[in-house]
C-alpha cells in the first residue's frame, strides 16, 4: 500500500457522479467514471491505496500523479494569491475591454440579424446615435480604470458621422482599436494598426470587401458560411477567418481543456464578462449585447464609478459554474464548458449530469 497524489498542476473537479481532471500545464482534460472518481477522492484525502490499481498506474504513466511512501501536503499550482480571494477589502476593479455601440443604423441586411446568440452588433429600426462628446467622456472614464482595448460596433459604425474623429481620439491615447463592420464602406484615413472585424453574410459582397480593405493587414472575416473555401482562399495575405455558430451549442465536442490563467479566470470570475464594459448607443450600460435588456445604468445620468462597482460585484465576479440553480452547479465540465450565464443551459446542454452521459 502506498499514497498517491495528483501533481500540483492537476485539478480534480467533481460532478454529481463523475469527475474531470484538468492538467493546467498541458491544457488537457481527463474524464473519469464514478469508480475512478471514488478512488482519486480517497487518495487525495490522504488515504493509502493499492499501488497496482489501474486508476493510479495509468495516471502515473501519463505523468499526472505520483506514488509516495509517506503522506505529505502538495501545494497546488495557482495563478492567484489566496489572500486576495479571502480578504474583506478587495482590490479596485480594472476595466480592460469596452464594447461601444456607436449607432443602430446599418446598410446591410444579414440573414441572421437580431436572431443570433451572442451578437457582435445590433441593428434597430429605431435609429439612435452616440454623441461624440459623450463618447469622449466615456473613454476618459474608462481610462481611469485601466482601459486597454475598445471594440466599436453598431449597426454599422462606419456610418457614424464622426467615426474618424472617434478613432483618432482612441489612437491618441494608445488604446488598441477594433471595429466591427460589414465591409461595404471603404475606410478612409483610419489608423493602419486598426483591427477590422468584417461580418460576412453574403459572398456576393466578397470582392467588394477585399477591394475596400486591401490596404489593411489586421483584418478578420467573421462568418457562419463554411462551404465557400474557394472564396476564402483568395483572402489577402495576413487576413484571418473565424467561423461562428448562430446558436449556442453545448456538446461533448465543445468541451476543452484550460491553461493556468483560463482555469482560474473561470473558477473565480465570469470569463465572458470579466473586466469588460458594454455601452449601447443611447448610453445604456448592459452586461453584454446578448442581454441588452438588462440595464445596469446609463453613462449620461449615473455615476460611472457606481456603474463599474455594480458590474464588478454582480457580473464580473460571478463564475458560471457557481450558479445556485441549474445543472451547471454540479457538473464536472463547468470549467471546460462554453456555457453562458444568460443561457438556459438545462435546455441547451446535451449532458445528463445525473446519468453522467452525453446525449
Regions found by a protein language model. Give the residues of each.
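Short beta-strand(s) of the beta-wing in winged-helix/HTH DNA-binding folds
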Residues: 66-67, 338
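Flexible mid-to-C-terminal extensions adjoining Fe-S/redox cofactors in radical SAM and related proteins
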Residues: 7-8, 295-359
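Conserved alpha-helical substructure of the radical SAM core
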Residues: 38, 54, 58, 62-66, ...
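Short cysteine clusters
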Residues: 106, 110-113, 272, 288, ...
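Short helix-coil junctions and helix-kink-helix linkers
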Residues: 40-51
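Acidic, low-complexity/disordered tracts enriched in E/D and polar residues
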Residues: 1-42
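Radical SAM enzyme [4Fe-4S]-AdoMet core and its adjacent flexible, acidic
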Residues: 176, 188-302, 307
Amino acid at each position: 500500500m502506498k499514497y498517491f497524489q495528483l501533481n500540483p498542476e492537476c485539478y480534480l473537479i467533481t460532478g454529481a457522479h463523475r469527475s474531470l481532471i484538468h492538467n493546467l500545464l498541458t491544457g488537457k482534460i481527463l474524464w473519469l467514471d464514478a469508480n475512478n472518481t471514488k478512488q482519486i477522492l480517497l487518495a487525495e484525502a490522504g488515504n493509502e491505496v493499492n499501488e497496482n490499481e489501474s486508476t493510479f498506474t495509468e495516471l502515473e504513466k501519463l505523468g499526472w500523479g505520483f506514488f509516495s511512501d509517506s503522506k505529505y501536503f502538495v501545494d497546488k499550482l495557482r495563478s492567484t494569491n489566496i489572500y486576495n480571494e479571502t480578504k474583506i477589502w478587495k482590490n479596485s476593479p480594472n476595466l480592460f475591454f469596452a464594447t461601444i455601440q456607436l449607432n443602430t443604423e446599418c446598410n446591410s441586411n444579414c440573414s441572421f440579424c437580431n436572431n443570433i446568440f451572442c451578437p457582435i452588433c445590433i441593428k434597430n429600426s429605431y435609429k439612435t446615435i452616440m454623441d461624440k462628446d459623450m463618447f469622449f467622456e466615456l473613454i476618459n472614464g474608462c481610462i481611469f480604470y485601466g482601459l486597454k482595448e475598445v471594440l466599436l460596433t453598431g449597426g454599422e459604425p462606419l456610418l457614424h458621422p464622426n467615426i474618424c474623429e472617434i478613432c483618432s481620439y482612441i489612437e491618441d491615447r494608445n488604446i488598441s482599436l477594433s471595429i466591427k463592420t460589414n465591409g461595404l464602406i471603404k475606410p478612409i484615413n483610419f489608423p493602419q494598426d486598426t483591427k477590422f472585424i468584417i461580418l460576412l453574410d453574403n459572398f456576393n459582397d466578397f470582392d467588394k470587401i477585399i477591394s475596400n480593405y486591401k490596404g489593411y493587414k489586421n483584418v478578420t472575416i467573421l462568418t457562419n458560411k463554411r462551404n465557400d473555401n474557394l472564396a476564402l482562399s483568395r483572402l489577402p495575405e495576413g487576413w484571418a477567418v473565424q467561423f461562428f455558430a448562430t446558436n449556442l451549442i453545448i456538446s461533448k465536442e465543445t468541451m476543452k481543456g484550460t491553461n493556468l490563467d483560463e482555469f482560474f479566470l473561470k473558477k473565480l470570475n465570469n470569463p465572458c464578462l470579466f473586466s469588460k464594459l458594454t455601452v449601447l448607443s443611447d448610453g445604456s450600460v448592459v452586461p453584454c449585447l446578448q442581454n441588452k435588456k438588462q440595464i445596469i445604468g446609463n453613462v449620461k445620468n449615473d455615476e460611472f464609478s457606481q456603474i463599474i462597482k455594480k458590474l464588478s460585484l454582480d457580473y464580473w465576479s460571478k463564475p458560471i459554474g457557481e450558479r445556485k440553480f441549474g445543472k451547471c452547479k454540479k457538473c464536472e465540465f463547468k470549467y471546460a464548458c462554453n456555457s453562458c450565464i444568460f443561457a438556459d443551459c438545462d435546455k441547451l446542454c446535451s449532458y445528463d449530469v445525473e446519468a453522467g452521459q452525453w446525449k
